Amino acid sequence: MDFTEIYKQSASLVAFSPGAHFILTAVQDRLVVRRSDTLTVTRTWSVDTSPSATQNALSSKAKTNAPSSSSPVNTWITHIGWACDSEYLLAACARGGVVNVFNIRDEEWSARIDAGAEGLVKAEWAPDGRSILCFSEWGLRVTIWSLVSGTATYIQFPVHADRGYAFRADGRYFVLAERHKSKEILGLYDTGDSYKLVRHFPLPTGSVSSLSVSPTGNHVAVWEGPLEYKLYILTLAGDLVASFAPDPDPGLGIRSVAWHPSGMFLAFGGWDEKIHILDSLSWSPVVVLELQRRVSAGTAIWREPTGWFEATQGRGFLSFERMQGSQSIPVSRPDLTKAHPKNGVVQLQWNKSGTYLMARFENAPNVINIYSFPTATESFVPRLSSVLIHSNPVLQAQWNPTREGNLVACCGNRAIYTWSDEWVTENGEEEEMAECIGVPARKLDVKEIKWAPDGKGLLLMDKDAFCCAFEVGAEDDKAES
């Protein structure tokens, strides 16, 4: 891989444009747009994050014994985002209750949204790229602002501001978990008709945690909060299709949910060591995958070489050691007396084609499990195909969005880790390979990674800095596109 120089950022606010031609970065109260092929600056804006008049009035009237904070951090950008066509971009300051919008083609054009008395928790683009969703404080409402008409549409009482909502894959419908008169309901809104309410129907949940719409757009999965391990499948018409609750209830609810890219399966796991897989025909469990403390010889087991970073001085790459025979996996024993024990499924993610499911368990923080799933024409026998054992806890792992068998992970050090099944031997046979790649930078511990939409580049982020990584040979293709 080729690595770029290190650049500043704040709050991990770095994002590729949907076409992967630009990189948007927030540095305190400034926005910077760079070309992704040369990293040269093409646009910069100094964002006005000063509170709105309403926010200032409320702040001046608020009576509190605590001293007011005048820290400049309170005026920093907290959210950024690209419109779907990369023409517009937003920068929000939740503390100030303002959202600023800019045009990549016209540096002089700008728009500003003042959240008002209800405050601002989160702002993001709608799929149409011309509407912005603003979530208020205290779960009061969601406001959809249209850049085309300049009007606002209000939806009252969302259950959560950071979850519990989704768009259908085609962007036509907006689904939102709401609470009215102490009852939880699901709202379906038509985005093509100014977010007009299509229907409301009651939810079977007592305290909904979140929801996820299937890739086909026909079903929505809704699950309970930490008091109960229960998941429901509903149609967008409001019909309850199925429900699932293991017996006995392992407690603390569901942590991770992931739809198969085709919508054929739904994978989810809680605070125990099990992953349940439901199929979309009967909505019944077809397989339960469990964390294995001892992995058999039939599984490819890869271990990070000891001391490789010091031996290579953080430059170049080195293959993982492939272990022979069955191996024990380092698994910690969680403290179940604590409110949030370090246990259970912390991440589930399917690859592009749905032939692999990546899973990470919090009580096995150094391990990545890769399960292989058959295609529609093969017999259904999912199995643990590969295990990656790292020297340090894995912070994040992400599948390549365009290639089926390409995974990248980071562990908070000056390295990234890759797994791929795309290697070809001298005999022309395909095989898998795991590698550790040093990042040639003295002050960049990779704590977060983001793929470019075209799958040819990576953003590697530390607390207040980032760099890009591109595969050797892919950069020329990127420039030609």
PLM region spans:
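Long, low-complexity intrinsically disordered regions enriched in Ser/Thr/Pro/Gly
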Residues: 1-481
